[in-house]
């Protein structure tokens, strides 16, 4: 008999709060105390660090009461274009960080928090990345904290396979993801492919620079500088939502109105 593990993925920002609430409330129901499940948190959302803390506090109480641990996948996030479209349409602040440096800094901050011995025994981690610098960072943090048995690396089949093989030589467990689609659902495979192509071609993305990655090369120097900058920023990166709309406190001054200076400006929708 093969044991099943249910893992909730994360897509748009609007699903973050409700997915977290559903995850916690479901596992609090009678009959689920001794079942484990997991969900993903996207580091490109500044809210995710606080959500990780919230889930960890809850999971530690659950574990102390005899319940099973849960699992969190710490990922970078791959739906930026969708978030940008929503932000533009509704005239809302962009929910994710608008630069990769803060994304990587938040990812490292979440990894450090999650790998504290008092946390990771209640919340096991899936460390999702193909970035050799970030993988090495997580590996060293786990060894320093003595928690290597409580996390797995996660990679996508066919991407950076030589890095995956190097990790396997260390003895650290790896979960490899591969998409599966029937002929009738092949359109979803196209969407998946486009996301992977976007990841591979982003100017600051590790995979774009991978083929030119040699010691002291331009790509090596760029990635090294980026990694060091993200380390310096990780304890200062913003935490919490970018959107703070409150209709009760807004000021409706004439000079900010719709027809000020004969220019039409659409009123943003209320973000419920």
Residue ranges, per PLM feature:
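Non-catalytic terminal/interface segments that mediate subunit docking, oligomerization
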Residues: 253-272
């Amino acid at each position: 008999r093969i044991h099943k593990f249910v893992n909730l993925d994360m897509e748009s920002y609007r699903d973050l709060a409700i997915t977290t609430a559903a995850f916690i409330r479901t596992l609090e129901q009678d009959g689920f105390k001794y079942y484990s499940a997991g969900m993903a948190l996207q580091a490109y959302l500044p809210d995710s660090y606080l959500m990780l803390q919230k889930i960890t506090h809850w999971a530690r109480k659950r574990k102390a009461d005899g319940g099973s641990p849960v699992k969190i996948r710490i990922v970078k996030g791959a739906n930026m274009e969708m978030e940008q479209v929503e932000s533009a349409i509704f005239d809302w602040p962009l929910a994710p960080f608008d630069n990769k440096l803060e994304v990587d800094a938040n990812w490292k901050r979440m990894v450090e928090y999650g790998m504290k011995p008092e946390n990771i025994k209640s919340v096991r981690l899936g460390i999702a990345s193909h970035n050799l610098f970030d993988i090495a960072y997580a590996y060293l943090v786990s060894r320093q904290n003595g928690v290597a048995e409580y996390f797995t690396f996660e990679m996508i089949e066919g991407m950076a396979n030589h890095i995956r093989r190097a990790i396997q030589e260390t003895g650290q467990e790896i979960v490899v993801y591969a998409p599966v689609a029937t002929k009738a659902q092949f359109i979803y495979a196209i969407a998946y492919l486009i996301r992977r192509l976007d990841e591979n071609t982003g100017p600051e993305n590790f995979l774009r620079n991978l083929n030119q990655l040699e010691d002291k090369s331009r790509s090596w120097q760029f990635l090294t500088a980026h990694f060091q900058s993200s380390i310096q920023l990780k304890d200062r990166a913003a935490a919490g939502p970018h959107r703070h709309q409150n209709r009760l406190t807004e000021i409706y001054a004439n000079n900010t109105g719709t027809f000020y200076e004969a220019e039409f400006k659409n009123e943003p929708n209320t973000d419920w």
